[in-house]
């Protein structure tokens, strides 16, 4: 493993709380990028000397910077950035460091959600939720120093064994429920709960992570607050000026600040008044849009008009005209990228295979949405397959909305009953719903947990049961029973903050014995859950496993924190497989793929996952494997030189730049050899 020490952090931005001496003031007239960068620094300032709720082990008030860590290999991807292995120089303690580029956050208009993720980490103090230890920043990046989970993710564990036996399934579902119950008690909805976002600690305990799409629900209103809100609504005019005023309020709320901030801080202090952190979202942050002095005056006029209207004052034609004019002025100055903020609470987030029906239909999400995802996870742990999968994302959504799922013919009836009670279309009817008396207690009382000791979860030193496959193989109607192996699947990677790539299948060497068990043991014990190696390739992600372009790797080496991809093997032509069809639009006529695979592309503080493609023309192009967009090309010349750097890393030197790359498949030598081979062949042809 190659260790890379990052030294060129900014002197004033490496850590600590922003002060007037280091942070520029918030000017009302500024450019979008400058204002956003200032807001981002203020919103995501590092911790004070006191630890956060999530981090009881923070030792001192010393301000951390990236210079305090040795940066190692890439572990994976979070919602808005790469995650790398970081070793603290002073203690040699290892962490997972999430690196977020400021300019990327601003460009994608994700400031609000980065703030929310940090706030959720700070609020959460539970053994089954990943801990946040430090946050700090440099001039270019924000850094989250997180608990390292060295055993990968739950999906990796499922793929190792095919499916979980009854005892291991019971234990790990209980740990997920324990962490989920804690989140929901704080009013937190994960909204993207899935096996890839459930990590495994070194001692194989569940750690829920990745809150980039999470949501913090407002605290329930008292009857007095509800009456006040109704009175305010009755005071609003019903004419067009009232509607325009309402729109103006929405437009003015397009800011990185939020009224929810103080409520969240109050909730945090009520959990532990001794724990103090700095304000995570500054109440005085300015909108990220570019404004002028005239527009600022318009904003002031709008606010005055709105206040008068809310107070029940009389409005005349001139006032209505001013409101119309000012609203149009504000709307014209709003960037189109900010409009989604108006409907964020109703927008689609999550991953298609685990998303709940109410999110697809654009209804308001709630904690009950996570219960649907829990049902999908239990189904997958018990069967090895996701319950809902279509050939396209749209068809998957249709299956979810219509609840079209098929159970294995020999699925344990107790587990099936639990899944049935969670995968319910109406959110409030799901087992464990907060809208029903009992809530999570009802879920814990299900017969699946009949002999489970819930109090044992508080003792994390107690080892969990071994993760192992059941005694009999699970069978779906229509499976080819005598096939030596079934296709392996991972869920499609539809979210911006996903961190897992397709890995190879497990082969079942005991199919004939398993088939005999199915025939002879129709009334098998409820403790036996079948094994399955089934899943299918995503149609949305690059697939390089077809034809002679790929060589499968053993699934035992996969990990969510070290995402792996089957690397391409030398193949002189496109063979018409799905891989070739997916990338053909970026190839010229007669151009053939020589080698391709996933790499981590490093440039300064930026770490991006890319699909690198070597062709015979020759060319080296790289593609965003999620968005399926061409991102760039490494310029080819007679002086291009590939060089091996370590077991994972290689460098491609061009006259103007060095490209530092890390092979996700851990075979950088294959890249070096392939490029050298093309260099020789192109030289001989010339």
Swiss-Prot record:
Superkingdom, natural source: Eukaryota
Gene3D superfamilies referenced in this protein's UniProt entry, alphabetically: Phosphorylase Kinase, domain 1, Pleckstrin-homology domain (PH domain)/Phosphotyrosine-binding domain (PTB), Transferase(Phosphotransferase) domain 1
Compositionally biased spans, kind Low complexity: 18-31, 222-257, 268-279, 288-321, 503-568
Keywords on record: ATP-binding, Kinase, Nucleotide-binding, Serine/threonine-protein kinase, Transferase
Gene Ontology BP terms: aggregation involved in sorocarp development; aggregation of unicellular organisms; chemotaxis to cAMP; intracellular signal transduction; positive regulation of macropinocytosis; positive regulation of phosphatidylinositol 3-kinase/protein kinase B signal transduction; sorocarp development
Region (Disordered): 1-31, 211-321, 481-584
The PH domain, residue ranges: 593-682
Entry binding sites for ATP: 79-81, 98, 147-149, 153, 196, 210
GO cellular component terms given for this protein: cytoplasmic vesicle; plasma membrane
Residues annotated as domain Protein kinase: 69-449
GO molecular function, one term: protein serine/threonine kinase activity
EC category name: transferase
UniProt key word Chaperone: no
Compositionally biased spans, kind Polar residues: 258-267
Family: Belongs to the protein kinase superfamily. AGC Ser/Thr protein kinase family. PDPK1 subfamily.
Protein name in the entry: Probable serine/threonine-protein kinase pdkA
Protein source organism: Dictyostelium discoideum
Gene that produces this protein: pdkA
